[in-house]
């Protein structure tokens, strides 16, 4: 079976080797195209470092919610005894109305 002839191994009748010359120049499109600029990386949010104020505010919010829920029931003690004084006034006014 005859071998395939490649352009590199082609020989004329003379026995001289004919080689295909490849162009050494790059195309104008490729040489004129600049390298694309690298996008600046966006700063990432650090989840490892937490603000100490954030923890305090969350705890305070949770406590406030508990106080509000308990205040709705009417059994929650409030600061400085304000609720106790109001309850006492209510009971006195109810007693006075009955007399």
From Swiss-Prot:
Region spans: Disordered: 1-99
GO-annotated molecular function: nucleosomal DNA binding
Subunit structure: Interacts with the ligand binding domain of the thyroid receptor (TR) (in vitro). Requires the presence of thyroid hormone for its interaction. Interacts with transcriptional regulator SEHBP. Interacts with nucleosomes.
Biological processes per GO annotation: chromatin organization
Pfam family, one: HMG14_17
Described purpose of this protein according to its UniProt entry: Binds to nucleosomes, regulating chromatin structure and consequently, chromatin-dependent processes such as transcription, DNA replication and DNA repair. Affects both insulin and glucagon levels and modulates the expression of pancreatic genes involved in insulin secretion. Regulates the expression of the glucose transporter SLC2A2 by binding specifically to its promoter region and recruiting PDX1 and additional transcription factors.
Membership in a protein family: Belongs to the HMGN family.
PROSITE patterns: HMG14_17
Protein name, UniProt field: High mobility group nucleosome-binding domain-containing protein 3
Modified residues (Phosphothreonine): 10
Modified-residue entries (Phosphoserine), positions: 6, 78, 93
Keywords: Chromatin regulator, DNA-binding, Nucleus, Phosphoprotein
Cellular component per GO, a single term: chromatin
Keyword Nucleus: yes
PANTHER family hit by this protein: HIGH MOBILITY GROUP NUCLEOSOME-BINDING DOMAIN-CONTAINING PROTEIN 3, NONHISTONE CHROMOSOMAL PROTEIN HMG
Compositionally biased region (Basic and acidic residues): 1-25, 39-53, 62-72, 81-93
Organism listed in the record: Pongo abelii (Sumatran orangutan)
InterPro entries named in the record: HMGN_fam
Primary localization: nucleus
Cell compartment(s), UniProt: Nucleus
């Amino acid at each position: 079976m005859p071998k395939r002839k490649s352009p590199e191994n082609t020989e004329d009748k003379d026995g001289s080797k004919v080689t295909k010359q490849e162009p050494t120049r790059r195309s104008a499109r490729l040489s004129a195209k600049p390298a694309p600029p690298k996008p600046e990386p966006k700063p990432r949010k650090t989840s490892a470092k937490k603000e100490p104020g954030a923890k305090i505010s969350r705890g305070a919010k949770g406590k406030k919610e508990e106080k509000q829920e308990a205040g709705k029931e009417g059994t929650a003690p409030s600061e400085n005894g304000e609720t106790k004084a109001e309850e006492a006034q209510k009971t006195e006014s109810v007693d006075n109305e009955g007399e």
